Amino acid sequence: MYLLEEFSVALERTFAIIKPDAVSRGQQGEILSRIHKAGFKIIAIKSMRLTKEEAGGFYAVHRERPFFGELTDFMSSGKIFALVLEADGAILKWRDTMGATDPKNAAPGTIRRDLGTSIGNNCTHGSDAPETAAFEIGYFFSGLELI
């Protein structure tokens, strides 16, 4: 006999960004709708415009990569929405909902395939691991802002 817990995926939180390209095209409503339809609970959300320095701190892991300057310029180019999402297996589930980084390679029906225009303008960001999610959530939200 098996216990139900053996087959369940843990309830977890992940971090998401609706990027400046999506906001400038007015796609945040569609993306928020898809988040809801996918079964996520939005724990926290805020809209803001990052400074280049804030974007650099957030993407510090990429500091030595050749695209770092372009990435921080882009992420500070307009308003973003930062979100904390909760669901069973939230990290993988959000990555599946977003689709592959390059919209051309993303599965049909994913956010990036349907709404993204290029690798650089792919609408969304999502944490790739629990440790990354913890850092990213803490970068944008204090514990008092989380339900």
Residue ranges and their predicted role:
Residues Y2-I147:
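Non-catalytic terminal and connector segments of soluble metabolic enzymes
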